[in-house]
Amino acid sequence: MDSCDYKSYAQALDLVNDKELIEEYKKYHKNVWKEVNEALCSIGIKKMKIFLLGTHLFMYYEARADFDPKIDFQKYTELTPKANEWDNLMRKFQQKISDIPENQLGEWWSPMDLVYDLDWFKQQQ
């Protein structure tokens, strides 16, 4: 697969507003379990980054063009008990974003709309 076979995604989620829990969450992500990374790669994720601002998480990832977050993230938790354990463990730190329209709520992470891409304008030149 070349870079044309991948698509970009962005999702958002909040952390529980507790400084100790946030620090613990960050520590876990410095040492993500090997099985979690392997499971993410096996469902077609090429790149993934999570950013934090206060209690707000922003996740950017690139996945194969036919990736479906609703289906493939479910597969990820089913692939290995460790991936499922990780997902359940992270839930103690996380909470859904409370102030977004109901139609934009995801299963857990909420999908974000792309409103700007520099590549749109590079193609015009």
From Swiss-Prot:
Lineage: superkingdom: Eukaryota
Annotated InterPro entries: Carb_Metab_Mutarotase, Dimeric_a/b-barrel, Rham/fucose_mutarotase
Family per similarity comment: Belongs to the UPF0734 family.
Any GO MF annotation of the entry: racemase and epimerase activity, acting on carbohydrates and derivatives
One Pfam family hit: rhaM
Gene3D superfamilies in the record: 3.30.70.100
Protein name: UPF0734 protein DDB_G0273871/DDB_G0273177
Xref: PANTHER family: UPF0734 PROTEIN DDB_G0273871/DDB_G0273177 (PTHR43239), UPF0734 PROTEIN DDB_G0273871_DDB_G0273177 (PTHR43239:SF1)
